[in-house]
């Protein structure tokens, strides 16, 4: 098998943007994490609605991500990113040598 055929057989990785409006949205986020998707979660609508519900949702998503060996981080004030195994989120404290 040559390199080109190996690349074409690899399944694509998808990036999905999701707006969290309610705690129940965590279920679809869980499914997408298990599928190995890169997720950009917009949390502002849920934050405006109920901060305690947002905190609970973020804690649950964090737990799901860690159990799937995914990486998770905040992107500014309004978003969270979740990446699958093999995709790490750069943080300022990392040494990229």
For the regions a protein language model found, what residue spans apply to each?
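N-terminal intrinsically disordered, cationic/polar leader segments
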Residues: 1-35
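Helix-rich interaction surfaces within compact, conserved domain-sized segments
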Residues: 1-3, 64-97
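Short glycine-rich, basic-tinged beta-strand/loop micro-motifs
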Residues: 33-46
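Residue-level signature of catalytic and energy-coupling elements of molecular machines
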Residues: 61
């Amino acid at each position: 098998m040559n390199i080109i055929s190996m690349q074409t057989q690899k399944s694509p990785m998808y990036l999905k943007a999701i707006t969290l409006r309610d705690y129940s949205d965590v279920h679809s986020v869980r499914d997408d994490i298990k599928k190995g998707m890169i997720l950009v979660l917009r949390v502002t609508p849920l934050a405006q609605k109920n901060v305690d519900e947002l905190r609970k949702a973020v804690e649950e998503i964090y737990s799901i991500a860690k159990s799937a060996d995914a990486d998770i981080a905040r992107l500014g004030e309004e978003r969270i990113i979740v990446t699958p195994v093999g995709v790490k989120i750069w943080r300022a404290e990392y040494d990229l040598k």
